[in-house]
From Swiss-Prot:
Function recorded in the entry: Involved in the biosynthesis of the chorismate, which leads to the biosynthesis of aromatic amino acids. Catalyzes the reversible NADPH linked reduction of 3-dehydroshikimate (DHSA) to yield shikimate (SA).
Name assigned to this protein: Shikimate dehydrogenase (NADP(+))
Record CDD domains: NAD_bind_Shikimate_DH
Quaternary data: Homodimer.
GO molecular function, one term: shikimate 3-dehydrogenase (NADP+) activity
PANTHER family xrefs: BIFUNCTIONAL 3-DEHYDROQUINATE DEHYDRATASE_SHIKIMATE DEHYDROGENASE, CHLOROPLASTIC (PTHR21089:SF1), SHIKIMATE DEHYDROGENASE (PTHR21089)
Source organism: Idiomarina loihiensis (strain ATCC BAA-735 / DSM 15497 / L2-TR)
Gene: aroE
Keywords noted in UniProt: Amino-acid biosynthesis, Aromatic amino acid biosynthesis, NADP, Oxidoreductase
């Protein structure tokens, strides 16, 4: 009989998290035995809660909002992609009390974009937001060699800092990322729009670029039972292929699960179908 692997997710809020069900389904497909729990915390208590979790036998944890960037400062070692992102969504214990911080968000997004037939290479992208979520996906998007990536953030200084960090790391040429404080300032047709802000959580509409390509597509990292406000905006603007971040959620979770449990990647198609079926 397999021993039970203790896993969890830290966030605030956290009661809504689908991670326990997703990982339970992964375990079902691989016949693993896991115990995956939600952990509510605050920024002040987050380091202690994480330390307690692993001290009491935790074997892996996810980190969600608002702790992804804080988690990057807690770990002993960062993976290359987590270092590039400046944010961590996966904690992996190794050695005596040591923690590796990784970030599977970008990988999850790229896999889901490919599943949906959305190509990034040589395309013009507009990414809304410059926070932890954007940091997690932009390095992986850049690896796909888009023609140009517009980073849209109300606080242009924050976006410029992110661009500068990426340039310093040698990940992007100076002309590959263009910063705009509003999408209205973009003066070329955009092929793919990605919302990495929390605007959809409060029903906030974003200003879209004035020019969209004929086959423009859109992706909201947020997800809900109904189309998000951002998705509705894009549909109204004529985008043909519009998706929420549910597929990314499943794919990044599968990457985390594989890091903890080893062996093959879980069957995400099965989990996606099960999660979309009303319980």
């Amino acid at each position: 009989m397999k021993s039970v692997t203790s896993l969890g997710v830290f966030g605030n809020p956290i009661a809504h998290s689908l991670s326990p069900r997703i990982h339970a389904l992964f375990a079902q497909t691989r016949q693993d035995s896991i115990n995956y729990q939600r952990y509510l915390s605050t920024p002040g208590h987050f380091p202690r809660r994480v330390a307690e979790f692993f001290r009491h036998g935790g074997q892996g944890a996810n980190v969600t909002l608002p702790f992804k960037q804080q988690a990057a400062s807690l770990v002993t070692k960062l993976s290359d992609r987590a270092r590039l992102a400046g944010a961590v969504n996966t904690l992996i214990p190794y050695g005596n009390g040591l923690l590796l911080g990784d970030n599977t968000d970008g990988e999850g997004l790229i896999i889901d974009l490919k599943n949906k037939g959305l190509n990034v290479s040589e395309r013009s992208l507009a990414v809304f937001g410059a926070g932890g979520s954007a940091r997690g996906i932009i390095p992986l998007l850049l690896e796909q060699k888009p023609r140009c990536l517009y980073l849209v953030n109300r606080t242009a200084k924050k976006a410029e800092m992110l661009k500068s960090q990426l340039e310093t790391l040698g990940l992007v040429a100076a002309n590959r990322i263009q910063v705009r404080s509003s999408a209205s300032e973009i003066d070329e047709p955009i092929d793919l729009l990605i919302n990495a802000t929390s605007s959809s959580l409060n029903g906030q509409r974003l200003t879209l670029p004035p020019l969209l390509s004929e086959n423009a597509s859109g992706y909201d990292l947020m997800y809900a039972d109904q189309p998000t406000v951002f998705m509705e905006q894009l549909t109204q603007a004529g985008c043909k292929n519009v998706s929420d971040g549910f597929g990314m959620l499943i794919e990044q979770a599968a990457s985390s699960y594989q890091l903890w449990m080893g062996d093959e990647r879980p069957d995400t198609a099965f989990v996606m179908a099960e999660m979309r079926t009303p319980s």
